[in-house]
């Protein structure tokens, strides 16, 4: 993965009593985009997660409101620069252009969560082969993002090692019998686990 780094940035803007305009919000977003990052990091997202005007909290959209000071909490997400460049280079070699970069867990959350889940709060877990990414949503905004270098391949590998079977058979067992939800499975149930190096099993052995 791109090793996402997630943090909340507070951006203040002096209003001088005038109404908040779209131009003001654009200035705030530009400031978050220009936030100094480490040399090996690349900016991915700058997403507003909360607005305040003169200490007033809970504002969903400040446009048209008056005040002296606007405070915007921005969720800034960055990724590993070298990994992102390798991905864009790979896309370029396929004679395709990269229009925009989107964190996979963020895209998965927007695609799979319903409006109430985004508003009330939910965590989207996107498990790939080697990386599992998460995105935390609340109040219709992504509040946090992270990733761990563990995925479905590691589960398959553990099954293969634990049952002394091949990776191919372990993947099949995971697909047919695996579940992330605990259930009352009869402990007397048996499944066929082909021994490592043997293709024909005489009967259920686990």
Regions found by a protein language model. Give the residues of each.
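A short acidic Gly-Thr/Ser loop motif
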Residues: 1, 124-131, 137-140, 149-153
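A conserved active-site cap/scaffold subdomain adjacent to cofactor or substrate pockets
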Residues: 149-169
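Nucleotide/phosphate-binding catalytic cleft detector across ATP-hydrolyzing
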Residues: 1-123, 142-143, 165-168, 172-206
């Amino acid at each position: 993965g791109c090793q996402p780094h997630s943090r909340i940035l507070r951006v203040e803007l002096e209003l001088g009593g005038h109404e908040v305009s779209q131009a003001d919000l654009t200035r705030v977003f530009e400031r978050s985009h220009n936030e100094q990052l480490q040399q090996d990091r690349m900016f991915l997202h700058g997403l507003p997660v909360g607005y305040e005007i003169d200490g007033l909290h809970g504002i969903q959209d400040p446009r048209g409101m008056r005040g002296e000071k606007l405070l915007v909490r921005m969720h800034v997400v960055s990724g590993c620069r070298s990994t992102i460049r390798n991905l864009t280079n790979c896309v370029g070699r396929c004679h395709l252009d990269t229009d925009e970069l989107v964190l996979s867990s963020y895209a998965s959350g927007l695609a799979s969560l319903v409006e109430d889940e985004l508003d009330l709060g939910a965590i989207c877990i996107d498990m790939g082969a080697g990386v599992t990414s998460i995105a935390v949503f609340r109040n219709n905004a992504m509040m946090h993002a992270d990733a761990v270098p563990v995925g479905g391949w590691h589960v398959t590998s553990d099954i293969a090692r634990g049952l002394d079977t091949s990776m191919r058979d372990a993947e099949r067992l995971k697909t047919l019998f695996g579940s992330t939800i605990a259930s009352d499975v009869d402990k007397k149930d048996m499944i066929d686990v082909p021994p490592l190096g043997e293709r024909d099993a005489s009967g259920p052995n686990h």
